[in-house]
Amino acid sequence: PDTSSATTITLSGSSASASGSASSNVKVDGGTVTISGGGTYVISGELSNGRIVVNAPKADVRLVLKGATITSSDGPAIDIQDAGNAIVVLAKDSKNTLTDGASYASGQEATAALFSSDTLTVTGTGQLDVTGSYKDGISSKNGLIITGNATITVKAADDGLRGKDYLVVESGTLTVEAGGDALKSSEGDDETKGFISLGKASITLTSSDDAIAATTDVTVKDTTLTITAGGGQANATVEEQAPPGQE
């Protein structure tokens, strides 16, 4: 993406600084960096104990991780609490690491190292290593979409990737090691949701429970899939067909 007009957030140990066009939307309080407005934010450096919080209702927020290492001791590394459209971009040739705490401070909705209350898209061509020490690795309370040509590795105490409404892995390389389910979509009140769709990606799943756990359908199309699961390969029928809307 064009980041020439982006706001730069530089992480440095237990603090951070922001510069650029929308830096007024960035508040730094110790190790907590809160983004309150739309725009593109390029994040680099290392945060030894802190998190990125997005609270920008109805705004389009793009977080470009460009060599970012974020470790939180008592919550998520990235917590997208409210946004109209949330995208995490893994910059070309970058290596990024997100690690959450094994226990969270009380009153938090988040359950994952990379958490979003709204639909979340993860894209780009860089590398992302996620350790979900508390529960999940990457989780969205709505939909979760993995696209681009990124290399993503997730280790999670519970579920690896969880999109409550749906989980779509369109492309890229994904490796998941999960104490619960590797890939999960759990919405059960709407029959058009709760599905998992896997496209032209290379996916390796190791899980103590199900590798692929969907409430409704699992579709697999041109996917290179390697599974080692304790609870079985999937709890839904796996069909070789195009995902919804892509026939």
Residue locations for each model-derived region?
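A composition-driven surface/loop motif
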Residues: 1-247
